[in-house]
């Protein structure tokens, strides 16, 4: 869940990316805001979104893991330059119980899977976990042509 600690970690990561002029890669998996923290938890949506927006031209890649719900979906994760989902991951603003309570019926299971969300324009790619390292590496290389691949990085990628 996203509370003040997670919000602070995302903000600090974005600030470090800016200082180092390095891409920000986030892999959220969250059921939403930590409601027991009250308004402080909800404030993290604005804080993390503002931090991600300050990245400017620095690449921001988000890999939505299962599940990615609520405040995370509606904040820093949704404004990445490239948004990837893992196959079958549940990605939506409201959880199943909230949807069921609002609609007074059960939401279909296939609604709001990564594939459904991609079809409706919220994701750029759906990539299996075993292919993520190479895919994210290629994306970052494309978005940051000034970063020269080093033999260490190339060797690491070859091992995957």
Question: Model regions: which residues?
Answer:
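Flexible beta-alpha connector loops of hexameric P-loop NTPases
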Residues: 1-5, 37-40
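Conserved mixed alpha/beta catalytic, RNA-binding, or beta-rich assembly cores of soluble enzyme
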Residues: 3-10, 44-45, 51
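A structural preference for short, pocket-lining loop segments at secondary-structure junctions
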Residues: 8-33
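Short amphipathic alpha-helical "recognition" segments used for binding
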Residues: 12, 48, 158-160
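A broad, low-amplitude sensor of folded, mature protein cores
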Residues: 14-17, 26-27, 76, 110-112, ...
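Conserved catalytic cores of soluble enzyme domains
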Residues: 31-148
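A short, charged, Gly/Pro-tolerant segment at domain boundaries
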Residues: 150-160
């Amino acid at each position: 869940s996203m509370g003040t600690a997670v919000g602070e970690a995302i903000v600090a990561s974005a600030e470090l990316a800016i200082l180092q002029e390095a891409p920000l890669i986030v892999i959220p998996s969250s059921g939403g805001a930590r409601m027991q923290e009250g308004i402080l938890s909800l404030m993290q949506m604005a804080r993390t979104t503002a931090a991600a927006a300050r990245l400017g031209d620095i690449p921001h890649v988000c890999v939505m893991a299962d599940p990615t719900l609520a405040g995370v979906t509606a904040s820093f994760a949704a404004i990445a330059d490239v948004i990837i989902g893992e196959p079958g991951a549940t990605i939506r603003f409201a959880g199943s119980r909230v949807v069921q309570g609002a609609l007074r019926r059960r939401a279909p299971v296939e609604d709001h899977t990564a594939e459904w969300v991609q079809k409706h324009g919220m994701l750029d790619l759906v990539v299996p976990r075993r292919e993520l390292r190479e895919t994210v590496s290629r994306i970052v290389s494309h978005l940051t042509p000034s970063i020269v691949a080093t033999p260490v990085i190339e060797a690491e990628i070859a091992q995957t």
